């Protein structure tokens, strides 16, 4: 697996689609801070997105989509002066999967959220800006538009297993949005995600994820990436925020935590599978990173 696939798999990324929103005239719907990674896409018309904490609204045109990566309240509206309706109440009145606001049907949005099985905020979301906006006219956005169109068709025509198909398509859309954001705005991400935008760092990350149990050295990674040891160390630290071996330790602990949450393998076997020579060596590293020993974590795994 590559690093992005690895992390999304570790997080057990799942999508959940909400009712669609049809709106017209002057309207505004205010939403509480979402506890998931929220997304919406404008399939018809145009509107404004105003996120709590941001001074300026975002113009959403037909075909645009966005992700909200922080738990902030937000408003979708025709204009900033329109009287807002409570989103919970609006969607509680939804019929046949469609909520309505204002008068008419000038605007049509689909949306939902992504949930994760473990601490996604630290592993993924904190490395993204609070709002990821993908305009329809963005170069190379065809894959995002294809996924959104396919979701729209599943929700509109509702063939067999349409909800399941649409939710899987939403995960496909998320991956394409993340790829596109890395390509067009590499300076707007941080951590390992930023590393994927640097070919040298991305090469090292790929090797680390491909074989985390290997006894990697910085020199060996540098050779694999075809740069000097000092170049790799400096670029990795500057981009990811920690050195290659520090990153490897953290990733090994994440893999260990997953095995402790989901399986019953003895700690010695887990240690061997993630590159530690002994159970005690893994225990020391685990406690240093997560603040508790593996045995306690297995009994009381952290969210």
Curated annotation (Swiss-Prot):
<keyword id="KW-0805">Transcription regulation</keyword>
<dbReference type="Pfam" id="PF12833">
    <property type="entry name" value="HTH_18"/>
</dbReference>
<keyword id="KW-0804">Transcription</keyword>
<dbReference type="InterPro" id="IPR009057">
    <property type="entry name" value="Homeodomain-like_sf"/>
</dbReference>
<feature type="DNA-binding region" description="H-T-H motif">
    <location>
        <begin position="219"/>
        <end position="240"/>
    </location>
</feature>
<feature type="DNA-binding region" description="H-T-H motif">
    <location>
        <begin position="267"/>
        <end position="290"/>
    </location>
</feature>
<feature type="domain" description="HTH araC/xylS-type">
    <location>
        <begin position="202"/>
        <end position="300"/>
    </location>
</feature>
<keyword id="KW-0238">DNA-binding</keyword>
<dbReference type="InterPro" id="IPR018062">
    <property type="entry name" value="HTH_AraC-typ_CS"/>
</dbReference>
<dbReference type="GO" id="GO:0043565">
    <property type="term" value="F:sequence-specific DNA binding"/>
</dbReference>
<dbReference type="GO" id="GO:0003700">
    <property type="term" value="F:DNA-binding transcription factor activity"/>
</dbReference>
<protein>
    <recommendedName>
        <fullName>Putative AraC-like transcription regulator</fullName>
    </recommendedName>
</protein>
<dbReference type="Pfam" id="PF12852">
    <property type="entry name" value="Cupin_6"/>
</dbReference>
<dbReference type="InterPro" id="IPR018060">
    <property type="entry name" value="HTH_AraC"/>
</dbReference>
<dbReference type="InterPro" id="IPR032783">
    <property type="entry name" value="AraC_lig"/>
</dbReference>
<dbReference type="InterPro" id="IPR050204">
    <property type="entry name" value="AraC_XylS_family_regulators"/>
</dbReference>
